[in-house]
């Protein structure tokens, strides 16, 4: 289990948001107590908290390959097979972790990489040249990934409390989301969150 988060915006220099980024990272500590990392530029920040299981030395995140930076949480069951396909296509690997496999799978197949991956995951890939973000979850939706899109702000995180740290997000309960909790018990409709301005990337969605 790991924790990921990120912010994209053009109206604020994120390099000047050190306190906010530290708070967001700290809020994910329960999902990744072993290590923390970040990628930061004026308009984008990716955060990662790691529970180190595979390749503790080589699997630090966010991980970069060319123009792409990934923050990843998950487990790929067919890592060896996907890695073999990529090696056959000319890719080489510096680590034994599945993060590098997912990153290079996206580099090779873009969104089509999801058809190759068998596992449970939530990840986001930021293209530093184009300034775009690709985020996705597994088919079952085991790994959580929530997001906020408000004005010129887009942010995502493994946990709702992480997004509630954003000054633009007020901790106001969404009445329809709360009604679902009361009617369905602990369940809720896929893609919904309990707080206003927040939503969840649906299972098998990008």
Language-model segments: which ranges?
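Cysteine-centered catalytic environments shared across enzyme families
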Residues: 1-203
């Amino acid at each position: 289990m790991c924790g990921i988060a990120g912010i994209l915006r053009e109206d604020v220099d994120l390099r000047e948001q050190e306190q906010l980024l530290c708070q967001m990272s700290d809020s994910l500590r329960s999902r990744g107590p072993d290590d923390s990392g970040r990628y930061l530029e004026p308009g984008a920040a990716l955060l990662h908290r790691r529970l180190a299981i595979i390749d503790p030395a080589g699997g630090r995140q966010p991980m970069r390959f060319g123009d792409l930076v990934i923050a990843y949480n998950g487990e790929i069951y067919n890592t060896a097979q996907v890695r073999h396909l990529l090696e056959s296509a000319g890719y080489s690997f510096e680590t034994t972790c599945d993060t590098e496999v997912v990153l290079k799978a996206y580099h090779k197949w873009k969104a089509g990489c999801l058809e190759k991956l068998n596992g449970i995951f939530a990840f986001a890939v930021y293209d530093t040249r184009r300034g775009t973000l690709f985020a996705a979850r597994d088919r079952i939706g085991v790994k959580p990934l929530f997001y906020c899109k408000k004005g010129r702000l887009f942010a995502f995180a493994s946990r709702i409390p992480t997004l509630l740290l954003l000054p633009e997000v007020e901790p106001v309960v969404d009445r329809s989301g709360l009604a679902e909790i009361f009617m369905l018990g602990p369940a809720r409709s896929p893609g919904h969150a309990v707080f206003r301005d927040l939503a969840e990337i649906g299972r098998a969605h990008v």
